[in-house]
Every structure is written in C-alpha cells, then in structure tokens.
C-alpha cells in the first residue's frame, strides 16, 4: 500500500470549517466509518485537494500526519464527508451547500424587471438618466444579455463605455443552453437576501473563484449535476438540476464583464462595490475617483467638445445601488458638461416638503455656495429617479418613523427602531452625495489633486455635521415627563461622593488644583452653589470675580431643592444628551421643560437614590435661574453653559468657548477663580480643568518641566502616554515633546487632587484598552474599544490645544482654536493621523472602523434609547 506525507503540504483554495468535518476524534482507522475521522488530525491537511486527487484512483493511500504517530486511510468518500449538506424543506432533496451553508438562487426573476427591458435591451430595468447625460443603469444581465446591452449602447452612438458593477456579493454565471445565467449564494433563513458586509479582506472576486471550484467538485460527486433554485416564491418544481461538466461551465463576474475589452478597445470594466444601505465609505469614493482619473475624456483636461464615455452601472435589480451610482455619475458629467437639457420636474418631486433637514441646512450655512451645491444634487437625484427617488424614500421613511406606535415589531425588533435606522441610512446617503458634489466643486477643476478621503481630512467639520444626523431631542418638551414616558432621576443616584466633600461643601467631589484658582465639582443645587460661592469669597480666599462653567449636555432641573434629570425608565443610567447647536438652544429647551413640569401640577414618578416615589413639585428651576438668584449676593459671578460630550475630546468649538470665556474674565480680573462642573465632577470637569490650567500658565508663566522619574512598572511607557499615534502628533508639532510634557504636568497636578477617584486622564487610556481582553461579552468589548480610543483622542486634543496656545500667543489668540485646527493643523496632517487613530503597537488600526473619524465621532451622538419627537 502506498503512502503520502506530501499531501499535508498542499494549501486548499477553500478550507472547510472544523465544525463541518463530521468526526468524533476517536482516531479509529475503520475506513467504512466516515464519522471516525479525527477533526484535529486533518486541521492542517488539504482534504479538498487530497480527495480530489484520488477521485479516479480507488486505491486508498495512507496519509501520515505531521507527528507521524497516527495514520489514516482516505477513500474518495472523504471529500463527501467534509462538505455540508442541507435542504430547503423536508419534501426537497438534500444536496451539498456552497461554503458549507448557502444555496444557489437564480439572481433576478421576471417580476423585478419593472421597466420590462430584458428582452428589448438585454437587462432588467435598463434606462438612461434624463437630461441628456450619458449615464445608464440596469439590473443583472446574463452573458448574452450583457452583449445585447453593449450593442444597444453602440447603436445609441457611444464609442466609449465605462462599466461599473456595484455589487459587493459574489455572482456566478451557470451554463444554461446557449447562455450563462447569474446565480447568487443565499442563506436558508432569507433566500431573498444577498450576502453583504463580507468579512474584512474577503473580496467578492476571490469568493467567486472559491465557489466555482466547489460547484465543480459538487457536480463531480453528483453525476455532473448540481441543484439550484429558480422559484423562491412558490418553489414550483424546485430545485432544478443544472449540468456542470467542467469549471468552464461556470463563469465568474470578471469573465463575463472583462472579456469584451478584447473586442471593444474603448470599453472598460470596474468592480466598485457599494453598500446596500447608507453612504459609501471614503475608500469606495476614492476607488471611483481613481477610475475617473484614468479616463481623460471624463476630465476638463480633454477637449470639451469630445463626448464623454457612457457610464453604465449595474447591481442586482438596477434600483438601490445602481441609482446611487447613477447620481454620482450624473454629478461628474454635470461638472464635465455643465447644466443639463431643460427637463420638467416630476410630479412626485413637487410634493416633497420644502423645508430641508437641519443637518443639510447646517451644511448650507457653512459653505459659501452651499445652496447651489445642494440644488445640483437634488437635480441629479430627480434626473435619475425613474426607478427610485432617494429623497422621496427618505421622507417616506421619516413619515413612517414619526407616525408608528411604540409596540409594533418587525421580525422581532422594534418597528420604530427599524424605520429610524432606515431614515438615518437614507439621510447619510443624501448627505454624502452633497459632500461628494462639494468635493467635485473643489477638486474636479484640479483633476482630483486630492483623493476624497484626504480631502475629507481637510474638511473635518463635515464629519462633525455627519455625526449629528438625528436631532430629534431638540423637538421635545416636558410633556414626555408629565405623560410618564420619561421619568425624573435624582442626580445623586449615579454620582457618588468619592472625595467626601458633601458634608462640608454640600456638593460631591469638590476640589482645587494646587496653588491655582481652578476648581472642579459635581453638579450643585441652589444651596450647594451658595456654599461654594461663600467658600470662594471668604476672608481666606477673597475671590471677587468667579467664572462658573457648567459642562453638561443634558437637561438639568432643580425641583423641590433636589437636582433631577429626565431619563428613559428602562435605561436610568443613560444620560440623554441634547445635540444643541448652541448653549442658548439647550438653555431654552431646559426652561421649556421646567415650565411644563411646574405648571402641570401632576404627581410624577421620580427615582431617588434607592427607591422610586411619586412627587408633585412646588418649585422647578433651571441652572440659569439658580445662578441668577446668586448674582445679587455675588456681583462678580459669571455663569456659562458650555456643553461638551462625555468621555470624548471636546469639539474644536468647545475649546473656543472655554478659552473665550476665560479670556473675558481674565481681562476683568487677572486673579479670578474658575469653577467647572459636570454630572459627577470627574471626566468632563477634569478635562476643562486641564484646559484652564494650560490657559492660565500661558497668561502667567509656565512652570519648569521636571525630569521624568524612572518608573519600572508594567506599561510605564503607555502610562506616560507614549503611544505611537501620540508620538506622531508630537513629531508634527514645533517643540512637540515640550508641549506634551506641559500637558502631562497639568494632568499630574490635577490628578493629585482626586486620588480616591483613581482617575487620571492619561493613565486611563491604557487601563481601558487592557480591559478589552477581559470583556464579558462583545457589547462590552465594543464599548471598551470605543472608550479607549476616545480617551486617546482626548489626550491628543489637549496636546494640540497647548500647541495652539504656544503658537498663537503672539496674536493673543485672536484666531480661534477651531480655525487654527482647520487652517493650520489640518494642512500639517493632524486629521489624517486622527483618521487612523489606534493602538498600532498592539493591533492593526485599519481593521477597526472606530479608528476612523467618521465612525468614532458618530458614536458621540449615538445612543440606544427609543426614538422620541420629530426627525428634523
């Protein structure tokens, strides 16, 4: 009997997962019992290739495993043993499953061809954008159908064609009579849904090649046939057996779409996967722009009289992704050709609301020609709306979101949540189309000198806008509380007095930076505010001018001399941040809620430190009213509300407001005191105290930097904040090392005052990152990953702010920090570094979406609370 050990060196093109190997690990050599094969023994052996090599040879060779202690006889039945089988229902035959779990389903059935163009044009829903633009869209054609489409374009007079397949899912073309017909792998749970969100690094093209090899093997094991499904509505006569003699009976997408280039030299094919929902990634925009760069006839560099190539886009049905791609193509040709031929606006467009979404209006307000940029996108959407109007779909989704009740469910999930997700995805897609048109305005005349992703890093404020799509909290009033939809929760319930200052100062966690007029505290009541002000103005401290800054983003009420905040009854710990455009907007909303609670005179459900009670409030004040009451006794008191996000770096404009408030106070009195508070007096308060310390040092004098102590503890390097990404920023900045050390000095001086809290803005970064490995579940792990990155970014922003204080000191900081960041720091590449933020010493940042600005900043305004109010 012959033996082979070399088979163990072969590398399979597709390795079956271990759970699909039907073995019990007994190690028996009984060749009749397939279940006796040890899964472990074959982990590193190419069963796929081995089995294939012996199909025509019934001699059973022996394979010696790597440790040379066990041997097994492998018959040709082994291949079958390592493929999974399944069936749609008990009445249907069992057969092999693609990739161990998928059924091959006919890609497009006749009902999807709404425009009825398959027979006349070769593809379902084939159409041209209106306005004379050379932009076409279609659903998935067969091989012969695609040839017919190309003939159609030639007959329309197009000498050049650039074709984009915008599908991310694998598509295989199986031979059927004289044509090759598209099939896609689908899950049994949802045979109507294609695969999407493929694993990181897994390309559809590679998956198609792997599936083709599998299908060929399946057919060899089943008499040169394989079962596929054509009718997944009624399953009449299903499944169908399709003949496969060789791999040439199966085409992959590239073979169908790329081969015409040999017959039509002016034809080009590109695969540009676009998402089913939401906006494309920056890398996908980059890929599209790179294709445009490669086609001179699409650029202004070319003779304007020379017609541009036809742009043809295709997905499965020719609707969602194709529609998105057609709009992108139309915008490009608008910049190439100018305004379109005069068209009548469709009836549907006229019935859409005239009022813009707030995030779109905010964009218009920030861009000089913003109105025109948005109008051009609206026009492009209208010109491509024959099959699908993304604006109409957006407003329809919004209407359903606001109109549906709480209790409804879709597939076990909240219907309201389903429509909220749909509205956010649609608005994000619309927003990114507008952003892309803004990019075209700047970069098209320059032949795309900057890629889209690099350009976005020069416009970081766009990411700030995109992070605030859902502004529904701005539409709410106190009615939610008086109706019992939300409840009032005592602030102290989730704000422990770790520093034990409540007894002496009537407020939790009150502290001072050593030798500096900078104080921090938890949220005070009217009485506690009086205690702190009395303490600061007593004979020992003698402060006559005090700036008090409240850093909270949520609604705060003092009712019956206790501090309460509105919360969801099912999630009492979650603060409800209000995405206000200004402090005044938040304070106005706060006053509305307070007035509603007071005038309702209802018994309201409130949560105290331990128990739940019903209370009727005789008083209900806002923070502004509390400080107004103290102003007569303390005429030098100035109160400011500067809401900054919890856990994160303050936004650029937050630094502006903090610095401006301090500058104004110091202009009045150079020895004024500064008090900061958030909810518990920890995260945001400490951040603001660091900003205040750095600012005062620049107004007065910066202490000498002491030499670093030699510390021999685990992670000492990272405890000192010497992460690779931090050092990249340090290297970019003039005197970067000195600037970082000054920030560290400020952080260390403040942490001395809060030792019992075990909270240090720099040291918490590595502490939180280390906790990711011990997370109890995936939800906790994702939260810890986010927090560690947010803490890292916060530390970097403090370093950048100190650099700004140094570099702009000569002009007394006339240029705001936000302007400096956008005009100076962005050109130096700071936002490009922040767009790859991660712990590169431990992991690959590119594999983590949260390392990118788009996703990380989006999380600042994301919560898992039920949708309330209107989507404005």
Swiss-Prot record:
Positions the record marks as coiled coil are: 186-210
What keywords appear on the UniProt entry? Coiled coil, Cytoplasm, Lipoprotein, Myristate
Using the UniProt record, give the first listed, main subcellular location.
cytoplasm
In terms of Gene3D superfamilies, this protein maps to:
Protein tyrosine phosphatase superfamily
Q: Which InterPro entries match?
A: Prot-tyrosine_phosphatase-like (IPR029021), PTP (IPR050561)
Query: What SUPFAM superfamilies has UniProt attached to this entry?
Result: (Phosphotyrosine protein) phosphatases II
Region Disordered: which residues? 1-37
Q: What does the UniProt entry say about where the protein is found?
A: Cytoplasm, Cytosol
Might you report a single GO cellular component term? cytosol
Q: Where is the lipid attached (N-myristoyl glycine)?
A: 2
One Pfam match: PTPlike_phytase
Q: Which family does it belong to?
A: Belongs to the paladin family.
What's the name of the protein?
Paladin
